[in-house]
Amino acid sequence: MAKEKKVEQITDMEVDFAQWFTDVCIKAELVDYSDVKGLFIMRPYGYAIWENIQKILDGKFKATGHQNVAMPMLIPESLLQKEKDHVEGFAPECAWVTMGGSEELPERLCVRPTSETLFCQHWSHIVHSWRDLPCLYNQWCSVMRWEKTTRPFLRGREFLWQEGHTLHATEAEARKETLQMLEIYAETCEQELAMPVIRGNKTDKEKFAGAVNTYTIECMMHDHKALQSGTSHYFGDGFARAFDITYTDKNNQQAYPHQTSWGMSTRVIGGLIMTHGDNSGLVLPPHIAPIQVIVLPIAAHKPGVTEKAEELVARLKAAGLRAQGDFSDNSPGWKFANWEMKGVPLRVEIGPKDIEAGHCVAVRRDNGEKITVALDELEARIPELLETVQQGLFDKAKRNLDEHTYAAHSLAEAKELQEKNGGFIKTMWCGDLACELEMKDKAGMSSRCIPFQQEHLDDVCPVCGKPAKCMIYWGVAY
């Protein structure tokens, strides 16, 4: 009964998926609300997930030659306006500072929604020669975008992210960088977060403000909606021209450098929740779980049980695992439900009979399977089980993606498939904006990406009947 009471605090996802998501965020102690709409407090458990993702990404960035920097939070309005497409894309979401103390500022300052303009202004001061290139920078920070509709992790007015910004001598180098960073995001999602992705190009309508090309990784959530989980942008030399960034090349000629930017945010935590979670709460992949193993003493009042549980925690920590024991006076049922809600990948139970038999019982969070583990094999078996859980979560998510991706050969069929099944609908496309808008208007789907891995489904666009140029994914997105 105690377990049921704990779990019933979470709305079933089949009843109301949006409320289920909010319940999990709050009940699992990931976030709390602040007094300002859209500004969320990230609690220690939620922040620990972000720290683990951050550590993985930061290592990959540094391994590819990138350096961390810190740019100011405030951008002068005149600076933001230097690149026309960029400012038009972000103007509706900007938050402005107009007062400094009791004095009105001579120029409005934008709280950064992204930092391209700040990096460009800096580079205009320091880049003069081909020897100054490439500039490979990244920063970890928060940004502000004044969203109208807000939700924890998915749509916050302030959110944490990393934004990489690089400057290169040639288009080829910049394009290589753009794709390299997209692949880092894809590998992180698939290998660390157990979230399968579709890699591809954004359409001109959906690309980043000021970009020549935007590349994306798209993930499918448990409710079969899409989540854009990371993007990488090639800007050409547009920003360089706007900010007068020039360098002397190896032929002693003046040239404009080529620019990229790429970002991943705490939105991926929302993706984690919606990809792996269930009606008991979070289900976390072991690679990024703040606690990988929770050890629970059963019949803790019996002699030697608590001591043995403490010993197991110490051994697991010594083996390099993130392990913790629950020695509170709550009932076993309450503890089971609590740690299930928090998504801990493995629960290890140890009681008097287990000690006598020389084993413990490991319980997988993802499927509830119970595995007997000999105590003298603990350090070998538990890491193996964690890897099994990690792979199992990826495989389950990949099945969800594959089973809910459909091919359509007409607009009517695309609409019918989406309304009946949700998921991704793949069709051919002529490349015209008018057909993209009609798909949105008639079938309620936006373009997700033009995948790198192309298939030939038809010769013509299903919307207009003109010759098709590519295959494209459509879907309803967060």
Regions from the PLM with identified roles:
Residues 1-478:
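NTP/phosphate- and nucleic-acid-binding module
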